[in-house]
Amino acid sequence: MSTILLVEDNPHIMKINSSCLSMEDYSVLEAADAAQCRYMLSNNDVDLVILDIMLPDGDGISLCREIKAKYDIPILFLSALSENDDIITALRAGGDDYLPKPYDIQVLIARVEARLRSVRKDKRYISFGRLRLDTCLLY
């Protein structure tokens, strides 16, 4: 079962997203701010972060950079900011996907599935410089 960390300061959005993702058989962790996000990441094995940009104790863009510097975890941004510049900034900061609010929950679930599929493919291989090993052949 994949573990998703939701970082969202709006309790209503958090509840809806958490419930819907749980119904899809994901393990869902919740963080209402950047500090809780850091704590959850340091104490749990997380497969995907769903990150809001506007947080009470910082911004999601800076937090994304911080996460990417320490962890190899895909980040899907959810934000009310929907201008092209906002999307470009988030993706250039290391975000792997961006979904503007409001959004259809089925689109969110489809994007989560796509991100996690890509993670599973990447984890199949180990790279050492130019050498790339298929871990399925090691067993």
Regions from the language model: what does each represent?
Residues M1-V119:
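N-terminal/domain-start alpha-helical segments
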Residues T3, E113-Y139:
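Short, Lys/Arg-enriched segments at the junction into DNA-binding effector domains
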